Amino acid sequence: MEQTATTKQLLEQYYSGFARKEGWETVLSDDFLFTGGDMTRPEPLVGKAAYRQVIDRFSRVFDAMRVKEMIVDGENACVIGTYDFTFPNGARITGDVAEIWKARDGKLQALTIFFDTLTFQKNTPA
């Protein structure tokens, strides 16, 4: 039961910082694994720095986010996050993202996300 609370606490801290666009990376492991956003690349990005680069780009188009649902089972969790986006072309969209998490040794270790990549491709310049 202790690990479930710890995983939930890590996620709550992550999402609190993520919504403010600051401080979220403190709960990530240095060898963090991120998979998502590009269906042609199934292998994960490795490292906190690599994930931070992805989020720096993503942060330009999301205005707000909130956790819609969180299910935690030991070191594993699934979060449905609702994001409000404003794209460079002016399009405004609210959408849900499925986020599958793995925690290890008191840090968030891995994240795999699922979302509507076509909407992003249509609304962001190449």
What do these predicted ranges mean?
Residues 2-30, 126:
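Short acidic-aromatic low-complexity motifs
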Residues 9, 22-76:
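A solvent-exposed, acidic/Ser-Thr-rich amphipathic alpha-helical stretch
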Residues 51, 65-71, 82-85, 96-102:
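Hydrophobic/aromatic beta-strand elements that line small-molecule binding cavities or substrate pockets
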Residues 60-61, 85-93:
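Short, cysteine-centered beta-strand-loop-beta hairpins and adjacent loop/turn segments enriched
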Residues 90-91, 120-125:
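A short, polar/proline- and glycine-enriched secondary-structure boundary/capping micro-motif
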Residues 99-122:
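Short beta-strand edge/turn micro-motifs at domain boundaries
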